[in-house]
Amino acid sequence: MDKLIVLGLLVVGALHVGLRIVSAEKLELVYQWSQLRDVSRGAALPNVVFSSDSVNNSEDTFNTYGNLPMGVTHHKGFLYVTIPRRRPGIPATLNVIDMARNPSVNDPTLSPYPNLLVNTLRSDFAADPKRIISVYRTQVDRCDRLWFVDTGYLEYPGGAGRQVQRPALWVIDLTINRSVRRFEIPPEMVEFGWGIPNIEVDVDGSDCGRAYAYMPDYEQRRLYVYGLSEGRMWRFEHNYFSFEPRYGDFNVARQRFTWYDGIFSVALGGRWQESSTERTVYLHAMASVSEIAVSNRILQNETLAQLGNGVYGSAFRHLGARGPNTQSSSHAYDPITGVLFYAEVNRNSIGCWNTNRPFTPDNHGIVHLDNDEMIYPADLRLNRTAVNYRIWRQSAFRAAAGTICE
């Protein structure tokens, strides 16, 4: 059976441009909101819970426009939705939707996960290893564990941002809804954690104790690796992790801006034929149209990482370019079809490449393109009545059907 993938949680502003070029029938709409609302204030469509443990007046006021969902992960009937704290007034950075209890497509309820207390900021901004500050994206592994990086950082505008505590890698056992590992990232590894937007977990379901987390840092242009059994973290640095100046200009819903984001996403590919454990790892920068590949055995070698780029540099391979306007945030690999899917920022689309074919622009296709509803999250004004947030899903097989990636 094809892997069920949630292709994206995307935010659309009040600005609607262009026509729908590809039918949205290939993607199934799971949920949508006009805006998230505060259940404790008696809103008409309440779907979030606010904390009574406020930091200050701004924290105690639910920020409708600041609660912007950024990441989503599906697992066994539950959707784990992240809302990074980039503004005050966000009750929970990590949330869950029980799909069985939310059969309607409109305005599902977000519940703080694993509970409200863990998500609540302390009134004095004090560090607390039992609490989560800000999360961008999550991943569930084959052993029913939810992995994510808490940046520990409040990205408030106007110079109000602050590092509440050290960034930390969390692992929560979803069968008991409790944390089973929290690794505080040491300052010699990275000073601030807000540049870590994604995480990819490499584990064999038959050996849950041997797992590795790959975490890109678009700000420092590094790739961090955490070994669960080792209980340590190491890092790789490479010129391929940097942005490509030619592809730093973005145009989203007629809003033009420049980004310098380096390595942004990591996707674990298929197993090598001659090995039961060696797999290809794909990675790319946000401001780039290139894709890089490396063996997971390289990344799992702590000694090699310590020897430096002069030793391991040639192990990273530049596969080529995807084509014009294919700058991508996240991407994911489906082991059944062998297809790599991309969230393409500049053309409001989901792209694809069948990894069994040469890496050329001609072998890259578009699964879905929608200039009306699939607009990448940006600093846009929200429409109070129009739908602003959507979650779609589709099987990898049906998503790739009829494209060059089939």
PLM regions and their residue ranges:
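Beta-propeller domains
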Residues: E25-F62, K76-L121, P157-Q163, W170-T175
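Beta-rich, blade/repeat-based domains predominating
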Residues: F62-K76, A127-L146, E188-A213, S242-V281, ...
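Short, solvent-exposed loop/turn segments at conserved positions within beta-propeller repeat blades
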Residues: R86-P91, P157-R166, Y218-E219, T277, ...
